[in-house]
Amino acid sequence: MERLLLWVSVLASLPEAFAHRDLTGKVFVFPRESATDHVKLITKLEKPLQNFTLCFRAYSDLSRGYSLFSYNLQGKDNELLVFKHRIGEYSLYIGKTKVTFKVREVFPRPVHICTSWESSTGIAEFWINGEPLVKKGLRQGYSVGAYPRIVLGQEQDSYGGGFDKTQSFVGEIGDLYMWGSVLSPNEIRLVYQGLSFPHPTILDWQALNYEMNGYVVIKPRVWS
């Protein structure tokens, strides 16, 4: 009987730490700098990516650098990484190679980010609040590997670990979607506006599988 009660207690605690939920109107809040607090995003990605688009909203008052989206493979870090180095400067890493995008920003202010990459041309796009930045090119012909470990709140230096609190994210993240294709400019603007857009094939904020670790809280999004 005691063992049964223990399992009931464990199962009762799972919905918040490990869940499949519609998070519409919600955000993950990372309230402090740490080397532990993070969210794992769970996806069954079994084939390498030739193309992708990733979109999300973020709000932070950090002026130092921090990771926004970290996608690692077993034995390969920075396979796909979105990193903000400083105010107005973002980088996209593909297979440890990076390109940097610069934008004039009002700080602190919520931001909507979309970034895409296609293997055939190597062209990477970066959109801030529905507006495109100058296109860059990297890793033409490369394939982003399958079976990733995807983390929000920390930058991975190993597969699901190797965190450094000086690169941790402090703030709020929401409305995260990922496709295995390059969205058109019109589609990216629809995502930014929160209107009807193509169904996400990799990560879907409205049906998200995730695991929260450490001090991470889900709260309503009160900013736009």
Swiss-Prot record:
Pfam families: Pentaxin. Coiled coil: none annotated. InterPro entries: ConA-like_dom_sf (IPR013320), Pentaxin_CS (IPR030476), Pentraxin-related (IPR001759), Pentraxin_domain (IPR051005). Its cofactor is Ca(2+). CDD domains: PTX. Gene3D superfamilies: 2.60.120.200. GO terms for molecular function: calcium ion binding; carbohydrate binding; complement component C1q complex binding; identical protein binding; virion binding. Ca(2+) 1 binds at residues 77-78, 155-157. Glycans are attached at residue 51. It comes from the Eukaryota. SUPFAM superfamilies: Concanavalin A-like lectins/glucanases. The keyword Signal applies. It is found in: Secreted. Residues 1-19 form the signal peptide. Residues 24-224 form the Pentraxin (PTX) domain. Binds 2 calcium ions per subunit. The keyword Metal-binding applies. GO terms for cellular component: extracellular space. PROSITE patterns: PTX_1, PTX_2. Disulfide bonds join 55-114. GO terms for biological process: host-mediated suppression of symbiont invasion; innate immune response; negative regulation by host of viral glycoprotein metabolic process; negative regulation of monocyte differentiation. Belongs to the pentraxin family. It is linked to SAP is a precursor of amyloid component P which is found in basement membrane and associated with amyloid deposits. Homopentamer. Pentraxin (or pentaxin) have a discoid arrangement of 5 non-covalently bound subunits. This is Serum amyloid P-component. It comes from Sus scrofa (Pig).
